[in-house]
């Protein structure tokens, strides 16, 4: 049986505020699918966990893992993978975890006058790209990552999230 290009994705609702967004899980699954189909990475045998949390939860994660004591919109935690060939009996590999904060995400969507689902799609794609090695530490990395995000989001019918901002030179 051929391997699916789509990683297994578990969505964990860790904060009650997400109950107001009953379509959030579907939005996340569509965003992961679109990203997985458009990247040059083998992710079909992998697993991802996406935790939908609140500002307090993501602030704790941000403080513990990055030393930054404030909430943020999304955090990604790529899993460390063993090297070498995988055997047929190996369990699926863990690609990593993504955490998304409701209040910060809602505020950003409102301030930028974007539909909530569009911003959720963007943050999910952004987090997924971090899991497979993309970053935005340098201008060149940011430009590459933003271009890929924009391409993936276009396939979801989401406008370029960077269109209202000056592009990096």
Curated annotation (Swiss-Prot):
Binding-site residues for Zn(2+), renumbered to this chain: 126, 130, 136
rRNA processing keyword on record: yes
Cofactor: Zn(2+)
Keywords, sorted A to Z: Cytoplasm, Endonuclease, Hydrolase, Metal-binding, Nuclease, Ribosome biogenesis, rRNA processing, Zinc
Single GO term (MF): zinc ion binding
Pfam family, one: YbeY
The EC number(s) this enzyme carries: 3.1.-.-
Binding note for cofactor: Binds 1 zinc ion.
InterPro entries: MetalPrtase_cat_dom_sf_prd (IPR023091), YbeY (IPR002036), YbeY_CS (IPR020549)
GO biological process terms held by the UniProt record: rRNA processing
Gene Ontology terms: cellular component: cytoplasm
Compartments in which it is found: Cytoplasm
UniProt entry tagged with the keyword Cytoplasm: yes
Function recorded in the entry: Single strand-specific metallo-endoribonuclease involved in late-stage 70S ribosome quality control and in maturation of the 3' terminus of the 16S rRNA.
HAMAP family the record matches: Endoribonucl_YbeY
Family membership: Belongs to the endoribonuclease YbeY family.
Protein name as catalogued: Endoribonuclease YbeY
The organism's taxonomic lineage, starting at the top: Bacteria, Pseudomonadati, Pseudomonadota, Alphaproteobacteria, Hyphomicrobiales
